[in-house]
Structures are given as C-alpha cells and as structure tokens.
Amino acid sequence: MGRLPVLLLWLAWWLSQAGIACGAGSVRLAGGLTLGGLFPVHARGAAGRACGALKKEQGVHRLEAMLYALDRVNADPELLPGVRLGARLLDTCSRDTYALEQALSFVQALIRGRGDGDEASVRCPGGVPPLRSAPPERVVAVVGASASSVSIMVANVLRLFAIPQISYASTAPELSDSTRYDFFSRVVPPDSYQAQAMVDIVRALGWNYVSTLASEGNYGESGVEAFVQISREAGGVCIAQSIKIPREPKPGEFHKVIRRLMETPNARGIIIFANEDDIRRVLEATRQANLTGHFLWVGSDSWGSKISPILNLEEEAVGAITILPKRASIDGFDQYFMTRSLENNRRNIWFAEFWEENFNCKLTSSGGQSDDSTRKCTGEERIGQDSAYEQEGKVQFVIDAVYAIAHALHSMHQALCPGHTGLCPAMEPTDGRTLLHYIRAVRFNGSAGTPVMFNENGDAPGRYDIFQYQATNGSASSGGYQAVGQWAEALRLDMEVLRWSGDPHEVPPSQCSLPCGPGERKKMVKGVPCCWHCEACDGYRFQVDEFTCEACPGDMRPTPNHTGCRPTPVVRLTWSSPWAALPLLLAVLGIMATTTIMATFMRHNDTPIVRASGRELSYVLLTGIFLIYAITFLMVAEPCAAICAARRLLLGLGTTLSYSALLTKTNRIYRIFEQGKRSVTPPPFISPTSQLVITFGLTSLQVVGVIAWLGAQPPHSVIDYEEQRTVDPEQARGVLKCDMSDLSLIGCLGYSLLLMVTCTVYAIKARGVPETFNEAKPIGFTMYTTCIIWLAFVPIFFGTAQSAEKIYIQTTTLTVSLSLSASVSLGMLYVPKTYVILFHPEQNVQKRKRSLKKTSTMAAPPQNENAEDAK
C-alpha cells in the first residue's frame, strides 16, 4: 500500500512532462460514461520516430468499428437508457512503450483526483501552456489493445486504477493469468486454444517434425511456447528448431532465419507466430533463397486471411494454412464505413490521412505549391467504388468488446440504479471492480450471432476458422484464401479441399524420417522421439507393429513382405516325383533280376554250378539283395507309424544279411587256404550248416538292436521344420518324415557297413587264392566296387544337409546307393552263373565241377573233397 502513492505521484509528474494534454492526437466523443480505445492506427516508426505509415485495415477499420458500435449502443433505447457512452480513442503506433504513454491519459483524471488539483502545473514542452484546459474524461473501461505486448504493458497500469480492459485481438496465453492481469478480458480466444488447434492440424496432416518461428514479444513467444507444450503433452510431434525473430532485426536477419530452417530440411512444416511485417520479410527471404514451395506454413491469427503479409509474395504463400478466430463480416459496418466521407466523419482525426492513402491522392499541397506527382483529392471519392474495400477481420471483435462493456454497464445500472433514468450517484464514479464483475458475467449473442462470454480468466471460448491460401487455375497471384475447416474444442479439417504444390491432392511430408515400408520396424534415434531408422524384419521375423519384429512360430514362415506369418508348406518324396523315378526304376529292375536269378537257381538247384556256388548262402545272399531293392519302396511311401517301423527294421536288414553271407563266404575261403598252407587238417565251421549259423548269428545282432530301438522309442512320423529351415524363408519347407535323424539313418546301416569293410579286408587277404577258385575274385571285385559306392554316398548325403532339396537328394542318394551296391553283388556273383546256366548249359557239367573240385583239393584234405562230392 505504501508504494501506490509514490507511483501515483510519479505518474502525475510524468503526465505533466509528457505533453499528453498538449495536442496529442485522439478521437473524443462526449458522453456520461467514457470508454477508452487503443488501436494501431499507424505502424511502428523507423529509428527516431514513434509512428510510421498508416495502417488502413488494422488501424482505421478497427477504430471506426468502435465508433460504429458506440453509435449503435447510444441509439438503442433498450440498452443503457438515458446514458450516453463517450470515447477517448488513441493510436498505439504498434509500439508497446508508445502505447503506454498514450494510455496514461486514461488514468489522468484519477491521478489528478488524488493529487493536488493544480492544473497550472501542466505544461507542454518548452513551457507552452496546454491547448485545452478542460478536465480529462474519467474512463470507466478500455477497449484494446491489438498486439499482446501492448495489452500487457497497458494492463499493468490499468489494473493499478481498477479499470477493466477488453481486448479485441490480443491472444497471448500469458494474459490468461488472472493473478497478474485480473482486470484484463478479451473477446478472442487465447493462443493456448489456437496452439491446440495448430497441433491438431499438424497431426491431421501426418506431420511429426516441424519448426517454430516467433516474433520477439509476448504474442509470438507465448504462442510458440503454448504450441511446444501442447505438442509435447499430446506426443507424436517433435520440434526441430525454435527460432525467434528479434524485435529490431538487423540487416540479413531473415536470410539467417531461412538458413537455420534449412539446417533441418525434413522439417518443412513451419509454425509461425509473427506479426505481419515479420511474416512478409520471411516470405521475401524465402524467395531470395530460391526455396519457394519448400516450406509449409501454418500461420496464427496474426496472418489469418490477410492479403497484406503476402502481397506480391503469393507464390511463397501457396499452401499456407492459417487460423483466424471464427468471425463473420458485419454487413451493418460495411454500409456504415462505405458511406464515410470527409464531410460526415470529421470526428476521426486520422480519416483525412486514410482518405489520401486509400485513394492515392493529396488533400493539400506541401508549402502551398501544387504537387504534380500526386493528384489532388476531390472529396467526392467513394470507398468501395473508387478503391478496393474488404472488411478487416477483427471488426466483429471490436464491436463485441464495446457491446460487452455496454451490457455490463447496463446490468450494473439495473442493479445499482433500479428505475432510474441516467446515471445515479451509485455509478458516479463507476467502480471498476464492480464493473469487472458484471463484465465477466455477461452472455449475449454478438454481432455475428455467436455467443459472447468470458471464463474466470476473462478468456473467450475458442472457435476458429481454418484457411488455406490456394492458387487459382495455376496462378498464385490470382489465388485466395479458401476455408478448409473449423476448430471448436475439436478439429474438423476437410482434407478433400486442401490443395498443395506439386501433387495437389497429396499432403507433402514434414517428417524427420520417411515412413518405414512393410516388413520394417522403426528403430528410434535416442533423444529424438520423432526420428528413426528403418530396420528390416529379416529372416524368419515379421513385423508385429511399427516398433517390433518377432520370429514366426516354428511351423510358420513370414509372408513375402514380412508383415505376418503363414504356414510352412510340407513336402515329402512322392511316387510321382522326378526324384523317385530313378530309385524306383532301379528297384523294380533289381527285384525282377533277383527274382529271375533265384528262380533259375532253384530250378537248377542240383546242377554243378549252383552246387559249387554254395546253395544255402546263395539263397541267403539273394534274399538280402531282394530286401535291399525292396527298401526303396518303403523310403518313397508316405511316412506313418507302420512304414517308419518297417524302415527301421528293413533298412539295415538287407545289407546286413547280404554282407554277413559274403563275409562268411570270404572268411571260409581265406581260412581254408591259410589252413592248407600249414596243415592238411580242415579248419572248423566250414560246413554249410556252420556257414548258415554264422550268417544268421551276425544278422541277429542287427535284428536285436533294431527291436530294442523300436521298444525304447516307438516309431512315428513327424513334420520337421528345422531340416529345411533355409536362410531364405521362401525356400523353407516342413518335411514329413519318420522320426529318424540323419545319424540314426546312418546308424541303421552302420553295422552292415562294418560287415562290408570286414568282408573287404578278407577279400584283400584272399586275393592270392589260385585263379581256379573262382569265388574269391568276384567277391573281391564286388566289395571294392561297393566301398567306392558308399564312399561317394557319404559326402553327397551329408553335403546336402542345408539344401532346399535335401529330402529329395538324400532319399534318392540313399536308395540309389543301396540299389547299386545290390546290383554290383548281383551282377558280379550271379549274373555270369545264370548266363551259363541259361545260355550255355553244355558248360554246366561235371567238368566244370571237376575244375572247381581240383582247385579245392589243392587247399583241402581228401576227406573234405569227399564231403563235397557227397553233396
């Protein structure tokens, strides 16, 4: 409380020195209650000058709107009957410090009322007495200002004197702080709503990476701050750069701004909270940098649907989306303003200057000399006929601000002066705090038919129209602003109406990273949530969502674009497969040959050749060869439990039986001749019965092992998805097979291969047997060839383990190897004998037998020969 008198005395002294009462320009209207008005009639002046060029729309249109509204209020018998509203309208020159000086005139009467009342102390600069000595009006409320920085400066003074203030254009969120600006209200929504609308627009366009551009000051900085805060809370939008345009930009400043924006070229969307001059100079710098069409502007209400910021810069503005508080053109004001002339509008002291500017003429010549460069005004010119005219966008809000004060005064008058016409003592003077209470309580339909009301912070509800500047027939200069949507707590944006450079119907991107393709996940860049790298879901992984890749289940493989999983195809070797053709052909031919030979031997069972071959072991060997050929059919058949059991049992049985018989034969021959070198006593176990016992004894080990395996692990078919899980998922197959691994399969053959190797060793040892003993050498050749076949089999079988055709190659290799080994035994041991039996029966005589017998006698005692003869 102690600081207020000091401040008041300081203000009184400043007023006496400032010359405010000394002819400073203002519009005055007499009335019982005076309203103040602050309008940017002139632009900010250059260095050393307070004011610059006249602002026809933002300045004169808005000022005339207040005069129009006052005329309407004063002419309304139902509103404030008996009370006439006066006015004191001042020019802020678009500068906050100058506006503060002007606004001090609103509190002049209050200061002098609290001071010593010595009006003689008021002097103009140089000691000249004031032109008017009438006491200043007592202002009850103020309409204005326009710029947020000006409103903030003025509000700090008006609140000290409890003078309510209603702005028609100030939207800075800072002004919503009722603890600091408790006497401030506005009929336009704050930028926090506007910022929310702009965030919604950015999200609707699919942008996630934008830059912000703000004019230094409360409006620009607060607007951007609100946008950044809301976008952070909403998520999904990142700020590439936040650039501030200095209040007094240096030469080249705007080129520097453009260069900075191009440091993040993917952030094409530019959120701009800037005054008209800055908007224009940014567009000019864009043109000079040859970047027309690169930036995608989203402008605040300071841009709105105005022509002045983009005049002659339409190419750079094409596609710009702008926001404007929802408004309507007031027809009554158009009729009022278009009938204004120099004769009927003398109350507006700036109207003559407007007339010259609007019609490009001069009312008087400088220095009394005629000026040939500019025509002279006739005074008969008409607005809208001899000059272009379009109602300025804030006219509606100026009118609504005046009516809000009028309605509040009316309600206050009804409460304090019931039944009284004109002002009563309770309203002389008018208490500002009481008036503020009634202002915050007003609710009426404004000049455009929309509700006018205030919340507890003095803010109006957020309602915006959304525009886009579009070219017409490919020409930007003949284009215009097209309404594309609305915002009232939620966005309604008509995407079909939007038009863009390049492809008119495709929204240009403003993203840090391009969208990932199908089957790719986003790998976020640390610290920049809107930037990412695209990582392919390779191998057997598929895209779960935009951030995650997961492996497909074991029985599935990814789709070609890796966006999902699909069943892995199941394959097996079928009867019709080309891979089965050769094995089946060999097996059929082998079985036919084996059957023919066995039948031939059985038919000629007692002939010398058959007897000399060892009939018992020959039949065992032929049976083993038959089983080897037969296994091919089991390997091609569709796997099931029975087939799998038969495979286990017969896969090694045929080879074991064959090689057991050959081993027994080879061992017998070797032992006979080795024994013959040392003694005439025959070796043991060389009789046919002994040979059969040895053969079946060796074979029984294989049978017992397989039976034990069947009991321990019952056979069944499985689909093996790992066997054909190739690097390329497109080549992956599930293999329907018996539950036998490659090693298990080789294990089935392992014992028979051991017998084969042992037999080969004996065949090598018996290679010195006399040539007349014809069984040893064919057996030797058979075993050598068989070893070569199986040596070739192993690398082929295991070398194709990762092949996409593994199931076919391995099965074919195995069956062909078995058939070839059986064919070698059949061809070398029995085909020659069968040939002799069938085609040269004259050789199948005792002589042949004698030859064999003679050979045997060389290595065996006479009694063994007799035994052979007994056979």
Curated annotation (Swiss-Prot):
Topology relative to the membrane: Multi-pass membrane protein
Tissue distribution: Restricted expression in the inner nuclear layer of the retina.
Disulphide bonds in the chain: 51-93, 238-530, 361-377, 417-424, 512-531, 516-534, 537-549, 552-565
A Pfam family of this chain: NCD3G
Keywords of the record: Cell membrane, Cell projection, Disulfide bond, Endoplasmic reticulum, G-protein coupled receptor, Glycoprotein, Golgi apparatus, Membrane, Receptor, Sensory transduction, Signal, Transducer, Transmembrane, Transmembrane helix, Vision
A molecular function GO annotation: adenylate cyclase inhibiting G protein-coupled glutamate receptor activity
Bilayer-crossing regions: 580-602, 617-637, 649-667, 692-712, 743-764, 778-800, 814-839
Topology feature Extracellular, residues: 24-579, 638-648, 713-742, 801-813
GO biological process, any: adenylate cyclase-inhibiting G protein-coupled glutamate receptor signaling pathway
CDD domains: PBP1_mGluR_groupIII
Signal sequence residues: 1-23
Binding-site positions, L-glutamate: 148, 169-171, 219, 301, 394
Tagged with keyword Transmembrane: yes
Subcellular location: Cell membrane; Endoplasmic reticulum membrane; Golgi apparatus membrane; Cell projection, Dendrite
Disordered: region residues: 850-871
GO cellular component assignments: cell tip; dendrite; endoplasmic reticulum membrane; Golgi membrane; new growing cell tip; plasma membrane
Glycosylation site positions: 290, 445, 473, 561
Chief location of this protein within or outside the cell: membrane
Coiled-coil ranges per UniProt: none
Cytoplasmic side: 603-616, 668-691, 765-777, 840-871
Function noted in UniProt: G-protein coupled receptor for glutamate. Ligand binding causes a conformation change that triggers signaling via guanine nucleotide-binding proteins (G proteins) and modulates the activity of down-stream effectors, such as adenylate cyclase. Signaling inhibits adenylate cyclase activity. Signaling stimulates TRPM1 channel activity and Ca(2+) uptake. Required for normal vision.
PANTHER family in the cross-refs: METABOTROPIC GLUTAMATE RECEPTOR
Subunit structure: Homodimer. Interacts with GPR179. Interacts with photoreceptor synaptic protein LRIT1 (via its N-terminal extracellular domain).
Entry's family note: Belongs to the G-protein coupled receptor 3 family.
Protein name: Metabotropic glutamate receptor 6
